[in-house]
Amino acid sequence: SFLANPAQYFFQQRLGVRFDTDTDQLRETESFVQDNLEKYQLAEHALALMISGDSLHVWEQELFASGQLLKGHLGESQLKAAIHKAGTIYNNLLLEGQATIYSGYVDCGTVELTGQVENGYRDTIWNYRTGQIRKRQLLKAWIEQLFVNALGHDSATRLVSTKLQSGIVKVENSFLKPVNRDEATTLLSEFVDLHQKALTYPLPFLPELSGQWFESIEKNEAEAARTKKIVTAWNQGMAGSEGKNTYYTRLFDFPR
């Protein structure tokens, strides 16, 4: 969690300071208008029911009976969109047989790292979501795989997500290749060291913008061009972006 937002982690865990964020404020829109988070949560719930084999029909009735969705065309269209998005992910999953839960501990020198990783099927760790996978979520998936590899399992990770292109929901598949046990342990130890530093000072690391920066390097973009792209993303980002995050803006600033 400290790498997902190092600024927030430092303020909350080291200083005990919490700021109000956009999601903490009272919504100014009508209650029947779904925001992106509510749409995502609805689709995630539908996907969980599909995977577990539980009844979608019972859940649908509960949504309308409780008032979480309005009866009529609007509520039905919202539900239909959520189920469609969940179905696009579900149809790309190969969760056959008994799921494996990887658990144990890894000696990282000064720290013994313990934990567990779920959703293992046939030597593959499945990471899926009905939304787009952000850089911070990709980093989390990578750390989980390193933990599994450091336990001695030669497991890869398959990531399944969605992306909206020209108004159409597209499925994206990507993979993280396994690394050998020693390399995985070494990399985990480096993350442990970063965590210790994160309790001393806020790490100057912004997952989304950092990811965009390295993608620009891979595309051989000129430094001036990629710098301009990052500054623009920070200054003109949408709600929920790092440039709009209260914790980041208390610590970092970019030229305008």
PLM region spans:
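Structural signature of nuclease core domains in nucleic-acid processing machines
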Residues: 1-256
